[in-house]
Design a protein with these regions (language model features):
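Conserved SAM/SAH cofactor-binding pocket of Class I
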Residues: 1-37, 41-108
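Residue-level signal for inorganic ion chemistry
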Residues: 3, 25, 99, 115, ...
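Conserved Class I SAM-dependent methyltransferase catalytic core
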Residues: 17, 127-190
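Glycine-rich, phosphate-binding/catalytic loops in enzymes
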Residues: 31, 112-115, 168-169
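Mobile active-site "lid"/loop adjacent to the S-adenosyl-L-methionine
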Residues: 45, 102-131
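Short, solvent-exposed coil/turn segments
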Residues: 74, 116-118, 182
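Structural detector for helix-capping/boundary residues
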Residues: 79, 91, 118-121, 169
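Flexible, glycine-/basic-rich loop-and-beta segments that form/coincide
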Residues: 192-196
Length: 196
């Protein structure tokens, strides 16, 4: 949803596996036409049109459209990262952003109490913490246009392993960005440009 905030004209699809989290994604993705009405929790409800401070404006058509079918700033999709790539046409996307689970099995055993309350499926990524990165590296490059970018959040010790996975799978211009604490936190990789 942050991508849509920074790029309001972009067509954005958000994919979520968990049915519980998907319900929240749908709620957060709903919006009114062109941001009209009052916004609450990133969600514009039909009542926002009825209470808007624009008495001279006829909210009727927009309100009726919203009540009939919610308008979405992004398209929410319930899907699984391990199979969703099969639904994507080749070379149509400009950007893929993913914050996949990245904790190893050993790290899962040492979680702080507040983190341990999170669902395991949101945290655990196999024995080495790389299972989701393997899928992204192997299957998602073809969905991007040449020069399109893949942006991944990583664990602070995963820079080299994720960089190697991406390089082995034909990604180009791989770089790492640090978080405000100075830890490796994000990797950006691109589908190679077509050479003429």
């Amino acid at each position: 949803l942050g991508v849509k905030r920074f790029c309001p004209t972009a067509q954005v699809t958000c994919v979520e596996k968990s049915p519980e989290a998907f319900a929240y994604l749908e709620k957060n993705a709903r919006c009114a036409l062109a941001g009209q009405g009052r916004q609450t929790e990133n969600l514009l409800e039909p009542t926002a049109f009825e209470q808007a401070d624009a008495p001279a404006f006829d909210w009727g058509p927009a309100l009726n459209a919203l009540k009939a079918k919610p308008a979405y700033a992004v398209q929410p999709v319930q899907g699984d990262l391990f199979t969703y790539w099969e639904t994507l046409p080749e070379g149509q996307l400009d950007l893929i952003v993913s914050n996949p689970p990245y904790l190893t099995a050993a790290e899962m055993q040492q979680l702080q109490p507040e983190v341990a309350q999170e669902p395991a499926m949101a945290l655990e990524a196999g024995e080495d913490g790389l299972v989701f990165y393997r899928a992204l590296a192997q299957h998602y490059r073809q969905a991007l246009r040449p020069g399109g970018a893949l942006v991944l959040e990583i664990g602070w010790q995963q820079r080299q392993a994720v960089t190697d996975l991406l390089a082995e799978n034909g990604w180009a211009d791989i770089e790492c960005r640090k978080d405000y604490g100075g830890n490796d936190r994000c990797i950006i990789a691109r589908r190679p440009q077509i050479k003429l």
